[in-house]
Amino acid sequence: MKHSQKRIFMDIEKMTSDEFKAFCRSGNKNYFTRIRKMPLQDLLFTMINRKGLTLALELRNYMKLAHPGVSISKPGYLKQRMKLNPDAFLELYKYHNRNFYADSTFSTYKNHLILAADGSDINIPTTTETLKLYGSASRKNTKPQAQIGLGCIYDVMNRMILESDCNKVKFNEMRLAEKQMERIPETIGNIPYIIIMDRGYPSTPAFIHMMDKDIKFIVRLKSSDYKKEQNSLTEKDQLVKIKLDKSRIRHYEGTPDGERMKELGEISLRMVKILLENGSLEVLATNLSQTEFHTEEIKELYHMRWGIETAYETLKSRLQLENFTGTKPILLLQDIYSTIYLSNLAEDIILDTERELDQKEANRKHKMMINQIVSIGILKNDLIYILLETDDQKRNIL
């Protein structure tokens, strides 16, 4: 049995556990207790099986496959959805991830996971409620488009979304990333990692927080960040002392961050100049040692950050994240987290297949590559058969 298959079966077992059912009820003991046309497990399966069709067609196709001769109305279905804890799939994908990293088959770079933090605006149905709750990034004098600010931490080598939070469209990305990094050990345990961030994330307190916690990072600086120190660089890879003078502490005066900055007096950052493909010269700040990671490796690691951009594109275009089944905030969160779960599930299966193919093609000069787009399409069509199959032997064949 493939590793990913085993994890899918573990997910199904979790979905049917009393503990998970209680979590899905959000504290209401009466939810999902009566036998209905759409019990909890079917409710979860319909969300995993979304294909971007109208809700009426989605329900018709699912019921035809799972319960031939039985139908459910759109209002009846949405009534059941409104009872479901919006964090149900958040809990489920983190459970799947914990099992993934408990395995020894994941990829690392010099024994480190390579993680990227980034945010993306998600277009959601525009209603008075969603505008009030999440806001809009639309320009003045234009029709407002409600948006959720989705912030994620992504494992770029294993293509897994580790952390995700739905926020107002305008949110503090660094503050969120720090909260998410506090939770990451719950998923990966004590596996060391390097976090990569783009401009907009860095701040002196953030660097201090990460260094105090021994978190390794690579962050792209704006030209205005530590401008004096950047202008004084004489080498393309240089260790720089950042003096924490009054001008840098002033903004944090009277806060724990300000007190910590006064206590330290200065911090050391390694600044690395890199040339981007568009010809612009950028400066990266890192606490990785020069002996362990040379200049070209820092550049290589930073470019790996692009994987999170690809992940957002996959969520939006391949998995149709922005094609929501309703307008209520609880339905939006359910759709977002179920899509992230499906994305991680797809990548787990694809990675398994890639490893299997690598073993078969080990002696070939030209190795075959897995087409991710085709693979996700096949998975979306076939996954429901695995979920609905109750015979273990038939599941293994699927």
Identify what each model region corresponds to:
Residues 96-105:
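A short, well-structured juxtamembrane/interface segment
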